[in-house]
């Protein structure tokens, strides 16, 4: 039936007859007793996350509240339907009891979520009658109000100014001494997040890791789950498959023998240079940022959103491992490695990359430029050689994102 939250179930032969007669189950068969089954509705006190008329792939959700958002369309699209959803579920949460409840309301096509008092991140999804995931959303559980602390970048060469959030996407703090200021990890062009390292990693001589930095994630019952799986990104319709498998990190393209195929370092078999709006210059359906914000991209005149990033003007915080420039904190976060999906965050050389939604090389020119890249800026100790704001990395790499106002 697609309905959830059956409460106060009684043994009564007339139950289903009553249910059918009422269409939506609102009462039991014994009028003097409590209702046998509740209707699946949106609570009257629920915070509408689409109140401004925008939808997105992530939402900032207040702790200790009940919130509701539309699950009818993909991302910020008004036309690309999610499909025939019948249920919603929590895929993972990075803090126990972060999410208290989540359910789908078929009548309105909305997801209702209730949060605990903690801050953190969660991933929820809707499924169809065949139990297939149709779409998923990142819930950024925090009291954070981005508009209250936006930072305007220095004007680029062509005069473009970007208004940045004061923290990475998914960070529950902007404080340098808080590990939770690091936020989440994304493959270039994907909407779904992965958790970053919760400790520095230690690599062995054979390139295995004795300390992996992998986080503990939880299901709705606070049981530990392995929420990140890894698959080779072979040519099997990876984009649509990624939508059905939002917790799978698609590694660098390989053939059946495990040998790297040199023609592409993308995670998907059909590359899309506009996956994050780098061509259209508009927020894309795959953009991971909440309503009103998007992944920064290069401007039409070629201005780079991190052109202001200058090691000579920045200070490296050797205690908290990050860069401070113009009062903004840019933490080193490490990466998820493109060829394995494992975390890399060495204490001796801590670093991170901030994705830009502009392609490094056009996918249409694959033969001439066989490696497909996304552009990013490098965060590391200024004494290192990586001192330019415009870098390129394979699209299957997992890096950080800092959203800008649309």
Regions found by a protein language model. Name each.
Residues 1-2, 308:
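Short intrinsically disordered, low-complexity coil segments enriched in acidic
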Residues 42-283, 360, 394-406:
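Short, compositionally biased
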Residues 171, 254, 259-406:
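C-terminal, surface-exposed recognition/capping segments
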């Amino acid at each position: 039936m697609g309905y959830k939250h059956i409460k106060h179930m009684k043994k009564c032969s007339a139950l289903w007859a009553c249910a059918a007669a009422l269409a939506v189950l609102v009462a039991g068969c014994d009028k003097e007793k409590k209702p046998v089954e509740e209707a699946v509705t949106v609570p009257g006190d629920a915070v509408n996350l689409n109140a401004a008329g925008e939808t997105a792939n992530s939402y900032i959700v207040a702790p200790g509240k009940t919130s509701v958002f539309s699950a009818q369309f993909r991302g910020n699209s008004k036309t690309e339907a999610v499909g025939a959803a019948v249920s919603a579920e929590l895929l993972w949460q990075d803090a126990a009891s972060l999410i208290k409840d989540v359910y789908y309301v078929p009548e309105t096509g909305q997801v209702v979520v209730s949060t605990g008092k903690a801050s953190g991140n969660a991933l929820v999804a809707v499924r169809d009658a065949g139990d297939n995931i149709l779409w998923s959303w990142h819930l950024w559980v925090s009291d954070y109000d981005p508009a209250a602390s936006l930072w305007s970048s220095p004007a680029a060469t062509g005069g473009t100014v970007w208004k940045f959030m004061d923290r990475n996407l998914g960070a529950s703090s902007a404080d340098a001494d808080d590990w939770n200021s690091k936020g989440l990890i994304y493959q270039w062009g994907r909407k779904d997040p992965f958790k970053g390292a919760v400790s520095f990693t230690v690599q062995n001589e054979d390139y295995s890791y004795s300390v992996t930095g992998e986080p503990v994630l939880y299901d709705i019952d606070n049981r530990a789950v392995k929420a990140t799986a890894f698959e080779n990104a072979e040519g099997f319709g990876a984009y649509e498959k990624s939508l059905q498998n939002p917790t799978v990190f698609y590694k660098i393209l390989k053939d059946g023998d495990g040998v790297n195929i040199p023609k592409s370092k993308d995670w998907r078999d059909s590359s899309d240079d506009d996956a994050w709006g780098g061509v259209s210059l508009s927020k894309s359906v795959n953009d991971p940022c909440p309503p009103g914000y998007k992944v920064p991209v290069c401007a039409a005149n070629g201005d780079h959103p991190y052109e202001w990033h200058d090691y000579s003007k920045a200070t490296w915080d050797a205690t908290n491992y990050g860069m401070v420039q113009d009062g903004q904190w840019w933490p080193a976060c490490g990466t998820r490695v493109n060829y394995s999906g494992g975390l890399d965050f060495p204490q001796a050389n801590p670093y991170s990359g901030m994705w830009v939604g502009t392609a490094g090389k056009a996918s249409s020119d694959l033969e001439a430029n066989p490696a497909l890249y996304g552009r990013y800026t490098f965060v590391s100790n200024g004494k290192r050689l990586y001192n330019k704001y415009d870098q390129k990395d394979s699209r299957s790499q997992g890096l950080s994102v800092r959203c800008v106002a649309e």
